[in-house]
Amino acid sequence: MTMLHLQNLFSFNTRVPINKLFFENNTHFSSNFSYKIRSNNISHLTLGIDHGIDSSSSNFIKALSDHQGDVLAKNEIGIIDFFEAKNLLVTGATGFLAKVLIEKILRTTPKINKIYLLIRAKDKEAAFDRLTSEIIESKLFKCLKEIHGESYESFIRSKLIPVVGNIDEPNLGMDCIISQQIAQEIDLIIDSAANTTFDLRYDLALDAHVNGAYQLMMFAKKCINLKLLIHYSTAYANGEREGLQYEKPFIMGESITKEKLTSHSPSAKFPLLNAANELDFVSKLKNSIKNNDEFNKIIKELGDERAKLYGWHDTYSFTKAMGEMVIDSMRENIPIVIIRPSIITSSYEQPFPGWIQGLRIIDPAIVFYGKGEFPGVYTNPYCLIDMVGGVPVDMVVNATMAAIAKHGNLQSPELNVYHVASSYVNPLLSSQISNYCYEFFSSFPFVNSKGDQVKVQKMKYFDNMLDYSNYISKELLNRHHEVEDSKMQKLFKRKVEFLKNCSKVYEPYTFYKGWFHNGNMQKLMEDMSEEERKSFDIDLSKINWRDYIIGIHIPGVKENVLKGRM
């Protein structure tokens, strides 16, 4: 599951909370403007028009999206029928993606039996409290509440069972008796647990994504009625591969570096990547270094070093790929579906347009830009980008439910991979995102604490980090040179450091040289009936990115994350 939070993303030393760095001035949206959500009848976006793209780039991009063609489903998967009377276990249950999945299952397949929700909590009471505050009372569930009226709470509590647990512990951290009961009952496991910080400490990332995958498979083997296990990974698990990336599983021992070496020299030798060895290596390192500060520094750098050695961009994508390897190596006869979304963004249509939980990936940059604090960006303007125009969360959920029904009915002991990403069927350039942000904030500007509307400028692009850093420093410090308060001056300097670190962390993605084939998604869509394609829409080719970003995504961030203020 590809869901990326702002908290703890950067390692530079500051005690100032991020909200104080950028939200200090109480900037808010101008009340003199309103915006309209786009209609459901949207046209396909043809790239290369009115965006300053040369003809060769235009022809190349258009060729990628023209393959989609007409989809004429002759049969149906039977999505709604499959979920009837089923029992599920969902890990990472209070996360962005899992909550949208739970809402959709309850709303469209109300005859499901039980959904056990693995929740991190100190005890059962705390888990119930999180269920109430983060799910039952969430705005996300308002449509379900309208459907059931006064019986809403009794309905949802009869279906959702909170369970105290932790993905990286034996029996997933569950009480022994409860884990035995669940192992006897469940038909499906949906693994949505992950730590989505790109530069997370290596030991913590290994625990979450590698040891977590191991513990998950150990528990799955105890589930006597298990029909399918669904694991959320990320399309960026493809690492430093370039060009078109197909939906291939990772095999233990493989690495991107080894692929590149053997493609040029078949006899070349390179160490095999083994997840167990990585866990053992970090464990021994931890025991040998007694000074916590020294260990924290070494382990932080180690994750990036190991990732780059084997051909991945960062600790996150590296450990997610190893997690896939663990699942494949342990699966035996368990049917597995691995869902690899790119970047998951706000809802496109269901349960309503624009719902999002937290600032994700490029959202902080969008907000900073609207506030006049992000005058330039470190990126290739012609990079095919899955970071905002990645994939709306409801389409990831729809693909998940369709894949569950398809492979749950087949129950074939295979591992199937689905790329849920837009770069192949409906590509978006980073320059287009900037243009759409400029268009939005020119029409719907923020208002600063003095009551003045913030005027944004066209984004400048940089392909050299030194030039970009110098530009950011000069621009931001010049804008705040009149501030004499030493504390505020320090705050502005920290803003500069924050943006530099932000750009450095995202550099592999803003200059990414690959795009993600989704042939299995296409086959899934062909298997669906016309009614299923309407109710469980997975057609990413039809999204008009301008309408989505201007009419849905940015307003959704404003309403659901910023709560109408900065």
Model regions: which residues?
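Hydrophobic/aromatic anchor residues within beta-strands of the central parallel beta-sheet
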Residues: 162, 229, 336, 472-474
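NAD(P)-dependent short-chain dehydrogenase/reductase
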Residues: 241-317, 321-410, 424, 433-441, ...
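Mid/C-terminal beta-alpha module of Rossmann-like enzyme folds, strongest
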Residues: 403-505, 510-517, 523-541, 560-566
